[in-house]
Amino acid sequence: MKLREIAYSRSGDKGEVSNVCVFVHDAADYERLAETLTADVVREHFGGLVKGPVTRYEIPTAHGLNFVLERALDGGVSMTLRVDPHGKAFQSLVLDIDL
């Protein structure tokens, strides 16, 4: 099962840091999400796109998780040559994770 089957996501950026929030559609799936979607799983999934650590923050009242991806944007919007300088694609890519 892909993460996209039980959740949706949003992403944002600040400098060369990107964050990706994942929220379950049904609150009953939050516990499963929190158990399986670790910072290590996200880091491994993004591979070489994220050059720094990945930190996970739990948002239980909103049934979501926030992942902070350090050194993920090659210097940030004004410096990177990436096609996606704001890191918006991370929100779609994270949903491809197998649970």
Regions picked out by a protein language model, each given a short descriptive name:
Residues 1-99:
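Long, contiguous binding/interaction regions
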